């Protein structure tokens, strides 16, 4: 026995030893498979279109100590981060250098100013401080202009200078000083070292003649502009070669600043003007001169507050004082120093200077400047009491009068934009000197603040100080024009600006000088403003750091030459300076002694806050000189250096330029350029009214100054973020200022667009402005006009401007994604370029230059309706952006015929969910990517004719939805030779295929005949048709369903047919294909040859008339159930809203449902055969139950309605057990009874088919619908519905335990069925494997059936979260709906109806048991619909739901801009909602594609179906979606049945050999099924690994059992043998006994 047993054990163990290591190896392989099978998670990261500002520049302290002395280049702006080259000089001037740079530039002034603690300093103190600062700061530091740009691109600066009028100054690159001046922005600008040593010597001279020295210091640069010295200085002033010239100025201007830039006689000033860069003014030897320029130029990014106080001094002493205190320019000194920068230069060589100036800046102004030079002295004298300017009086007293008017001091602080413009005319020269000092100090502290503003302020002073070299010097420093005196018109930059004004100002020397001086000052900030006169206008634009303000404020002096004369007249009355400082940002004060008088009333203090974008402009009435001086001090804020804007005159010119200045789009990116609406007369009137009663705080320009500059400034306040511009204009004296204010509408709309208002003043100025205003002057004018109309408070202005701002900012946002030009042409004016109407956008028959090169994106609200037809025929579209179609989500017909498309990608049509007709004919398409048409599940027609397609590669027509509706495909007129895409042949609905005029072989025809069973008409190439016609009779005899239509040409054609052998052979492959087709299809196929005149086009007119067959309510019912079978609340409301649109009959609903169920049952009867008859019978029973439930639903509805009327809660507790039992049984049975579990899964939820078939609630009773429609109008009825629903939800909680127990029972039931079936089948171990696989499949289904059941139980988190989406989606979810809907109903009936439509669509009548609702009440989920992501409690808190709902609506309304057109970079609330919904549905709808479709449809219905004009389209979408789900479910039923009956085939073909899908139809179907199977989706490999693992586990267990059994047997046998052995002796012994 033992020996016999051993062989048996060996037999058993040997296989074990053989198979033992195998499982280990398999486990390793499985592990690798599992790792590879990790599900791919893709998350869409929304792109953010928002441009991030570079960040607010560091605050610039007004104190010089805050400025780094060590960075010589500090004043320079970083070229890369802030590239303001496009802004032009004005922009550069406007853009404050980085805080350090600007700080350095401002240092001299800040030191003098801050050290004194007041703007005005004693001449000695001022000079000393300037010298110290000069010593401390390198030339680059002193200059506010960015050295990088100036050094790197002097040419650009020259161009800027030309723009600004500094061309002449810049044009004199001869002298190194000019070069320094080029660098002055970066290096020597504050203290132009290039000025002749003479000038420096003068600056070094004792401050005794401080009055003169101050101006001369500043004038040193301008003094260099003096006709005589200017020529010398041009050659040597920068090189300090003109020291000989210094003596003249030295006498007048002994100052430390003069030492650096010794004030030159008017002659020298001329030379300084010649400096190619405003450097002359920037680099005058005298520090005071440079310092002067610095005050003008100084901009402090962080806190930029520049006050420009100019007091014209009648005497040379004033200029000296100004020299000492560069801000103050004595009339005498001023011409020399200031004139260098400004055209104030002495009249000695007026013609020469004119030439030089004009060369440097603009030749136009020489004569004017000469006149101005003369007049400037006069002006200086005339303004004997120049109104004191704000702290920073850049221009000499005379100039201040004119210049201040032209340029209010503007201080801009990127973080804090505070624009204070205070112009106070000083009656006396001494006052002007004081102002100059103060100005210089301010500029010292605020050099960086806003060089352009200061420069602006300074240059206007030049005309006044033409007599005084000192003031000119200051202005020169402030502006680039310092080299040339105004008289010489070397300050041509200034003069040019002023020149336009000078014709008028020529009479008024002061005004012209002021204009000149203002430009002169601008030179100092070449970075900010290159050209003084033009630059001043640019300066007026006060450079703002893109980070903070991003906008340039360019006030245009409304009053021009006359204005300055008027100011001259009124100079005795110093306007009270208005220095409203913005809370956080730079304050810009633009007071001018002369201008203040006339313009000061005009110049309101303008405060701009980036954050609030609120601009407050308060004009201050001009007062006497004494007042002007104190205001200066007050104006100067140590924290915010004030930037002096150009005087009105300069502002006129400069503002036009400044207006032009653009700011980087990153920040505010908008330039505000006010237009001076008032012309010379208004300015005169303003001057007359120059002393405003006080500067009323007019958010917009004050009456006086507001007219010219303030109007512009008013325009300045805009906040890109808020796009809220508040402009309040309080005219102090005249009404004109308000019009000006109105004119100065801030043009926030275009952040990147510079708005340049054109001055309405003199023609000369307007011309200059127009030139300067390269940016659309017309547009600016229009804007200004609109603003003028808005003269009212900023709030009123805001609407007009805001609309503009929003539209433009929107354009800019789009610009982020697409070129602005393209957007401007395509997005903004789409309905102007194309034809919009009747739901159609037609862009055909355009001029060649207008033709589209890419798909245009419409702006929101461009068209009130939706575009269902897009016709882009005959354009130049060569590429389709992936997200461009989001703006056309409702498009059903797209015509791209006759364009330049070369290839199609899988995302080429993303977003066209509703598209049905696609015409791509007559393009240049060569290749079509795989899955190209997958985003188009409802596509019916494709026209690809007349292209260059040579092959249809694998997957061209592949789509997860199988292209269920595609019935017409045109491929003719293509060099098509191969068709390798099996999906083309398997298109389920294809009825018309045109392959005429192609090169397809006979093999393609065979595949079509074999696989395209629904094809009704096939057009083949003529040669192939003729070959077939030769065997017409044979073919039609073999297959009666194939008909050949042969034309006369084929009958008479005897051409040899290469396919003759194959076709003619009765036993050949072709005939066999025909026989096979006859066996499995009855559809008649007509084969025709191509028509000789066959056109590649197709008439699409008939397609539009085609309508979906929606007469059967079952379509709608199933549609809704497919979309959201989970929501079973208040279904009648959904139907009452949807059915009218879908034109469903109001009767026969139950019958239709019954018929549908019957049809489904018949189909299943055909499929379910054999041992599954039990399932078939069970399904029939389920169908009958569903019908009974359907019929009983009507009674239930009626009862419910009655209960609702009575206001009593529905007695649901009694009914629930019965009601739930039906659906639960259905859901439970569906899992194991129906082979169509894939259908459930495919239909977007494990509930699809079972619920649609068994759920009576999905279709409302026929009689109930009309009643509901009638009641819907009754608000009280709607409220009662909600209340009863809420009560019902509360009552249904009791059903949860039942549901849970039922679920368990269902699982038990499933197992028991399996056990019964297994013994029944019992065949072999193979069968056992089969049964195991079947169980495995069923177990995979169980989670979904469980999901269905769990939908009813609160424990199902996934579903509950899904339900929570509904609060936003469906106020009608019984959980959250009651409160939400109730509130909305209280508001309006229409709102209720709309919401019902939007959201009830989601609720959909589901077949789910009532119990499902009960869980909803308890769910607290973060609503995924809520973009904010805040969690709220659906049921309990009414307020939360209501608020959330409102929030969603708001988000939907506001979303279009970011959502649709920014190709977002920021995902819209709709996108976020869709993503969250997709995630929530993951556990319920494992199939990724179906889940995405369902989520997208739900999102569309929720977010985009609120409008009445889209409700019909929405209803169509719902119907189509339901139809698609039905088709997919029907297909999966057959597949599922086959798979369950043939598990071996399912196992091998479905999972193991995916590549074989293209080889055989069966394998293909199996593969598709696996894709649709619940639980497989993207985890096919994982499932395969699990299956293999299960098999291995079973094998191992079996082997172990076998071994154990064998071992036991051996033990038993051993025991038996042992027992026998033990018994044997006993017998022997017994026998042995006797």
UniProtKB/Swiss-Prot annotation:
<feature type="compositionally biased region" description="Low complexity">
    <location>
        <begin position="482"/>
        <end position="493"/>
    </location>
</feature>
<feature type="topological domain" description="Cytoplasmic">
    <location>
        <begin position="1603"/>
        <end position="1634"/>
    </location>
</feature>
<feature type="compositionally biased region" description="Basic and acidic residues">
    <location>
        <begin position="1201"/>
        <end position="1216"/>
    </location>
</feature>
<feature type="region of interest" description="Disordered">
    <location>
        <begin position="758"/>
        <end position="777"/>
    </location>
</feature>
<feature type="compositionally biased region" description="Basic and acidic residues">
    <location>
        <begin position="1181"/>
        <end position="1191"/>
    </location>
</feature>
<dbReference type="GO" id="GO:0016020">
    <property type="term" value="C:membrane"/>
</dbReference>
<feature type="region of interest" description="Disordered">
    <location>
        <begin position="172"/>
        <end position="531"/>
    </location>
</feature>
<feature type="compositionally biased region" description="Polar residues">
    <location>
        <begin position="760"/>
        <end position="770"/>
    </location>
</feature>
<keyword id="KW-0472">Membrane</keyword>
<dbReference type="Pfam" id="PF15779">
    <property type="entry name" value="LRRC37"/>
</dbReference>
<keyword id="KW-1133">Transmembrane helix</keyword>
<dbReference type="InterPro" id="IPR015753">
    <property type="entry name" value="LRRC37"/>
</dbReference>
<feature type="region of interest" description="Disordered">
    <location>
        <begin position="1181"/>
        <end position="1227"/>
    </location>
</feature>
<feature type="region of interest" description="Disordered">
    <location>
        <begin position="1614"/>
        <end position="1634"/>
    </location>
</feature>
<dbReference type="InterPro" id="IPR003591">
    <property type="entry name" value="Leu-rich_rpt_typical-subtyp"/>
</dbReference>
<feature type="compositionally biased region" description="Acidic residues">
    <location>
        <begin position="1624"/>
        <end position="1634"/>
    </location>
</feature>
<dbReference type="InterPro" id="IPR029423">
    <property type="entry name" value="LRRC37AB_C"/>
</dbReference>
<feature type="region of interest" description="Disordered">
    <location>
        <begin position="129"/>
        <end position="154"/>
    </location>
</feature>
<dbReference type="InterPro" id="IPR032675">
    <property type="entry name" value="LRR_dom_sf"/>
</dbReference>
<feature type="compositionally biased region" description="Low complexity">
    <location>
        <begin position="358"/>
        <end position="368"/>
    </location>
</feature>
<feature type="compositionally biased region" description="Polar residues">
    <location>
        <begin position="172"/>
        <end position="189"/>
    </location>
</feature>
<feature type="repeat" description="LRR 1">
    <location>
        <begin position="137"/>
        <end position="160"/>
    </location>
</feature>
<feature type="repeat" description="LRR 6">
    <location>
        <begin position="912"/>
        <end position="935"/>
    </location>
</feature>
<dbReference type="Pfam" id="PF13855">
    <property type="entry name" value="LRR_8"/>
</dbReference>
<feature type="region of interest" description="Disordered">
    <location>
        <begin position="619"/>
        <end position="642"/>
    </location>
</feature>
<feature type="region of interest" description="Disordered">
    <location>
        <begin position="1306"/>
        <end position="1329"/>
    </location>
</feature>
<feature type="repeat" description="LRR 11">
    <location>
        <begin position="1151"/>
        <end position="1176"/>
    </location>
</feature>
<feature type="transmembrane region" description="Helical">
    <location>
        <begin position="1582"/>
        <end position="1602"/>
    </location>
</feature>
<keyword id="KW-0325">Glycoprotein</keyword>
<feature type="repeat" description="LRR 2">
    <location>
        <begin position="230"/>
        <end position="253"/>
    </location>
</feature>
<dbReference type="Pfam" id="PF14914">
    <property type="entry name" value="LRRC37AB_C"/>
</dbReference>
<feature type="region of interest" description="Disordered">
    <location>
        <begin position="53"/>
        <end position="104"/>
    </location>
</feature>
<feature type="repeat" description="LRR 9">
    <location>
        <begin position="1002"/>
        <end position="1027"/>
    </location>
</feature>
<feature type="compositionally biased region" description="Low complexity">
    <location>
        <begin position="238"/>
        <end position="249"/>
    </location>
</feature>
<feature type="glycosylation site" description="N-linked (GlcNAc...) asparagine">
    <location>
        <position position="296"/>
    </location>
</feature>
<protein>
    <recommendedName>
        <fullName>Leucine-rich repeat-containing protein 37A3</fullName>
    </recommendedName>
</protein>
<feature type="signal peptide">
    <location>
        <begin position="1"/>
        <end position="35"/>
    </location>
</feature>
<keyword id="KW-0732">Signal</keyword>
<feature type="topological domain" description="Extracellular">
    <location>
        <begin position="36"/>
        <end position="1581"/>
    </location>
</feature>
<feature type="repeat" description="LRR 3">
    <location>
        <begin position="267"/>
        <end position="290"/>
    </location>
</feature>
<feature type="repeat" description="LRR 12">
    <location>
        <begin position="1359"/>
        <end position="1384"/>
    </location>
</feature>
<feature type="repeat" description="LRR 10">
    <location>
        <begin position="1124"/>
        <end position="1146"/>
    </location>
</feature>
């Amino acid at each position: 026995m033992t020996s016999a047993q051993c062989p048996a054990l060996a037999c058993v163990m040997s296989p074990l030893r053989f198979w033992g290591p195998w499982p280990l190896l398999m486990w390793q392989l499985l592990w690798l498979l599992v790792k590879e099978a990790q599900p791919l998670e893709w998350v869409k990261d929304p792109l953010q279109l928002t441009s991030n500002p570079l960040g607010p520049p560091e605050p610039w302290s007004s104190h010089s100590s805050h400025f780094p002395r060590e960075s010589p280049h500090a004043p320079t702006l970083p070229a890369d981060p802030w590239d303001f080259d496009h802004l032009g000089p004005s922009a550069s001037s406007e853009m404050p250098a980085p805080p350090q740079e600007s700080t350095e530039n401002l240092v001299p002034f800040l030191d003098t100013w801050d050290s004194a603690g007041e703007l005005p300093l004693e001449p000695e103190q001022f000079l000393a401080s300037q010298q110290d600062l000069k010593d401390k700061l390198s030339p680059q530091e002193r200059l506010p202009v960015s050295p990088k740009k100036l050094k790197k691109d002097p040419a650009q600066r020259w161009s800027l200078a030309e723009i600004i009028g500094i061309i002449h100054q810049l044009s004199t690159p001869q002298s190194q000083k000019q070069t320094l001046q080029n660098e002055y922005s970066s290096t020597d600008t504050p203290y132009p070292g290039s000025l002749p040593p003479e000038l420096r010597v003068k600056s070094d001279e004792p401050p005794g003649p401080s009055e003169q020295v101050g101006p001369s210091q500043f004038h040193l640069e301008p003094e260099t502009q003096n006709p005589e010295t200017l020529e010398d200085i041009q050659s040597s002033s920068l090189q300090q070669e003109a020291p000989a010239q210094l003596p003249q100025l030295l006498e007048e201007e002994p100052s430390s600043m003069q030492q650096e830039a010794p004030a030159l006689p008017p002659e020298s000033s001329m030379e300084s003007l010649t400096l190619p860069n405003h450097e002359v003014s920037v680099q005058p030897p005298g520090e005071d001169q440079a310092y002067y320029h610095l005050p003008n130029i100084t901009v402090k990014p962080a806190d930029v507050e520049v006050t420009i106080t100019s007091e014209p001094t009648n005497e040379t002493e004033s200029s000296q004082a100004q020299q000492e205190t560069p801000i103050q320019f004595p009339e005498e000194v001023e011409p020399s120093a200031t004139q260098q920068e400004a055209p104030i230069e002495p009249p000695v060589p007026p013609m020469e200077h004119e030439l030089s100036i004009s060369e440097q800046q603009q030749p136009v102004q020489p004569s004017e400047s000469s006149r101005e030079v003369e007049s400037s002295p006069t002006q200086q004298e005339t303004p004997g009491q120049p109104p004191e300017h704000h702290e920073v009086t850049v221009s000499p007293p005379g100039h201040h009068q004119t210049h201040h008017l032209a340029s209010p001091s503007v201080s801009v602080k990127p973080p804090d934009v505070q624009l204070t413009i205070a112009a106070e005319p000083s009656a006396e020269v001494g006052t002007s000197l004081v102002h100059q000092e103060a100005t210089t100090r301010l500029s010292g502290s605020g050099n960086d603040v806003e060089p352009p503003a200061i420069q602006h302020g300074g240059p206007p002073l030049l005309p006044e100080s033409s007599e005084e070299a000192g003031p000119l010097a200051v202005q020169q420093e402030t502006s680039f024009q310092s080299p040339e005196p105004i008289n010489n018109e070397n300050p041509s930059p200034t003069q040019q600006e002023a020149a336009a004004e000078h014709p008028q100002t020529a009479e008024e020397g002061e005004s012209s000088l002021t204009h000149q001086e203002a430009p002169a000052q601008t030179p100092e900030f070449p970075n900010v403003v290159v050209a003084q006169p033009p630059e001043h206008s640019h300066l007026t634009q006060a450079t703002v750091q893109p980070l903070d303000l991003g906008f340039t404020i360019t006030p245009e002096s409304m009053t021009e030459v006359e204005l300055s004369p008027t100011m001259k007249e009124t100079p005795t009355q110093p306007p009270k300076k208005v220095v409203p400082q913005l809370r956080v940002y730079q304050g810009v004060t633009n007071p001018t002694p002369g201008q203040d008088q006339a313009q000061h009333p005009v110049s309101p203090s303008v405060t701009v806050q980036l954050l609030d974008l609120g601009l407050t402009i308060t004009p201050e009435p001009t007062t006497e000189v004494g007042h002007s001086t104190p205001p200066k001090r007050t104006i100067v804020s140590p924290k915010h250096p004030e930037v002096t804007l150009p005087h009105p005159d300069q502002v006129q010119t400069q503002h036009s330029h400044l207006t032009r200045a653009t700011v980087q789009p990153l920040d505010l990116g908008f330039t505000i350029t006010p237009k001076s609406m008032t012309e010379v007369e208004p300015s005169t009137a303003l001057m007359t009214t120059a002393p405003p009663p006080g500067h009323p705080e007019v958010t917009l320009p004050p009456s006086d100054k507001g007219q010219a500059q303030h109007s512009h400034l008013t325009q300045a306040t805009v906040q890109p973020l808020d796009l809220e511009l508040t402009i309040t204009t309080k005219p102090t004296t005249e009404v004109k200022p308000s019009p000006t204010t109105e004119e100065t509408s801030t043009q926030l709309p275009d952040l990147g667009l510079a708005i340049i208002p054109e001055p309405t003043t003199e023609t000369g100025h307007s011309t200059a402005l127009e030139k300067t205003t390269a940016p659309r002057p017309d547009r600016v004018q229009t804007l200004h006009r609109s603003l003028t109309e808005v003269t009212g408070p900023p709030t009123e202005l805001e609407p007009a401007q805001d609309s503009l701002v929003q539209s433009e900012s929107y354009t800019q946002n789009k610009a982020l994604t697409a070129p602005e030009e393209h957007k401007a042409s395509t997005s903004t004016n789409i309905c102007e370029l194309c034809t919009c109407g009747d739901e159609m956008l037609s862009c055909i028959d355009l001029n060649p230059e207008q033709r589209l090169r890419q798909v245009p994106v419409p702006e929101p609200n461009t068209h009130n309706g939706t575009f269902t037809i897009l016709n882009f025929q005959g354009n130049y579209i060569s590429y389709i952006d992936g997200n461009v179609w989001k703006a056309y989500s409702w498009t059903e017909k797209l015509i791209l015929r006759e364009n330049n498309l070369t290839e199609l990608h899988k995302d080429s049509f993303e977003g066209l969910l509703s598209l049905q007709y696609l015409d791509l004919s007559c393009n240049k398409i060569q290749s079509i990517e795989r899955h190209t048409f997958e985003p188009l599940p409802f596509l019916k027609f494709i026209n690809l004719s007349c292209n260059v397609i040579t092959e249809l590669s694998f997957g061209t027509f592949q789509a997860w939805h199988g292209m269920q509706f595609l019935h017409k495909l045109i491929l003719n007129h293509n060099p098509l030779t191969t068709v390798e895409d099996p999906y083309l042949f398997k298109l389920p609905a294809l009825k018309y295929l045109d392959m005429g005029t192609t090169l397809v072989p006979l093999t393609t025809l065979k595949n079509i005949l074999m696989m395209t069973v629904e094809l009704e008409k096939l057009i083949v190439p003529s040669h192939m048709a003729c070959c077939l016609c030769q065997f017409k009779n044979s073919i039609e005899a073999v297959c009666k369903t194939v008909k050949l239509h042969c034309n006369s040409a084929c009958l008479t054609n005897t051409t040899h047919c290469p396919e003759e052998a194959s076709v003619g052979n009765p036993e050949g492959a072709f005939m066999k294909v025909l026989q096979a087709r006859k066996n499995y299809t009855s559809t008649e196929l007509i084969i025709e040859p191509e028509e000789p005149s066959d056109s590649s086009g197709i008439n699409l007119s008939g397609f539009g008339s085609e309508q979906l067959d929606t007469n059967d309510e079952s379509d709608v019912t199933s549609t809704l159930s497919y979309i959201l079978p989970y929501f079973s609340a208040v279904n009648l409301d959904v139907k009452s809203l949807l059915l009218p649109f879908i034109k469903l009959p109001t009767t026969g609903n139950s019958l239709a449902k019954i018929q549908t169920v019957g049809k489904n049952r018949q189909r299943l009867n055909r499929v379910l055969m054999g041992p599954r008859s039990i399932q078939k019978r069970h399904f029939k029973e389920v169908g009958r139950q569903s019908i009974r439930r359907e019929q009983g639903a009507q009674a239930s509805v009626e009862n419910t309605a009655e209960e609702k009327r009575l206001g009593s809660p529905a007695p649901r507790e009694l009914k629930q057990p019965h009601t739930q039992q039906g659906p639960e049984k259905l859901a439970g049975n569906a899992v194991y009874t129906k082979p169509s579990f894939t259908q459930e899964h495919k239909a977007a939820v494990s509930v699809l088919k079972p619920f649609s078939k068994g759920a009576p609630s999905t279709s409302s009773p026929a009689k109930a619908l009309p009643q509901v429609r009638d009641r819907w109008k009754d608000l009280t009825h709607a409220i009662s519905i909600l209340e009863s629903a809420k009560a019902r939800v509360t009552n249904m909680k009791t059903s949860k335990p039942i549901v849970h127990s039922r679920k368990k029972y269902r699982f038990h039931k499933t197992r028991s069925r399996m056990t019964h079936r297994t013994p029944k089948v019992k065949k072999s171990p193979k069968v056992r494997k089969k049964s195991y696989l079947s169980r495995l499949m069923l177990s995979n289904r169980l989670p979904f059936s469980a999901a269905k059941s769990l939908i009813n139980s609160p424990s199902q988190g996934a579903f509950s979260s899904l339900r929570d989406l509904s609060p936003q989606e469906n106020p009608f979810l019984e959980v959250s709906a009651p409160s939400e809907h109730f509130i909305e109903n209280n508001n309006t009936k229409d709102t209720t109806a709309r919401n019902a439509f939007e959201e009830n669509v989601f609720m959909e009548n589901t077949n789910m048991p009532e119990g499902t609702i009960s869980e909803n009440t308890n769910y607290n989920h973060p609503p995924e619909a809520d973009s904010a992501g805040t969690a709220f409690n659906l049921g309990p808190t009414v307020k939360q739901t209501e608020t959330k709902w409102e929030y969603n609506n708001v988000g939907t309304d506001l979303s279009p801009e970011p959502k649709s057109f920014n190709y977002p970079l920021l995902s819209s609330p709709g996108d976020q909602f869709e993503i969250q919904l997709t995630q929530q549905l993951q556990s319920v709808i494992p199939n990724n594609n179906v889940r995405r479709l369902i989520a997208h449809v739900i999102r569309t219905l929720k977010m985009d179906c609120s409008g009445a004009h889209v409700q019909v389209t929405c209803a169509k979408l719902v119907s189509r979606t339901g139809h698609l789900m039905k088709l997919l479910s029907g297909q999966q039923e057959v597949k599922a049945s086959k798979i369950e009956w043939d598990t071996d085939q399912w196992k091998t073909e479905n999972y193991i050999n995916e590549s074989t899908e293209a080889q055989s139809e069966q394998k293909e179907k199996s593969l598709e099924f696996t894709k649709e199977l619940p639980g497989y989706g993207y985890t096919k490999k994982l499932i395969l690994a699990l299956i293999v693992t299960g098999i291995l586990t079973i094998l191992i267990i079996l082997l172990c059992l076998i071994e154990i059994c064998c071992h036991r047997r051996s033990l038993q046998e051993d025991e038996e043998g042992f027992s026998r052995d033990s018994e044997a002796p006993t017998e022997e012994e017994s026998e042995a006994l006797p």
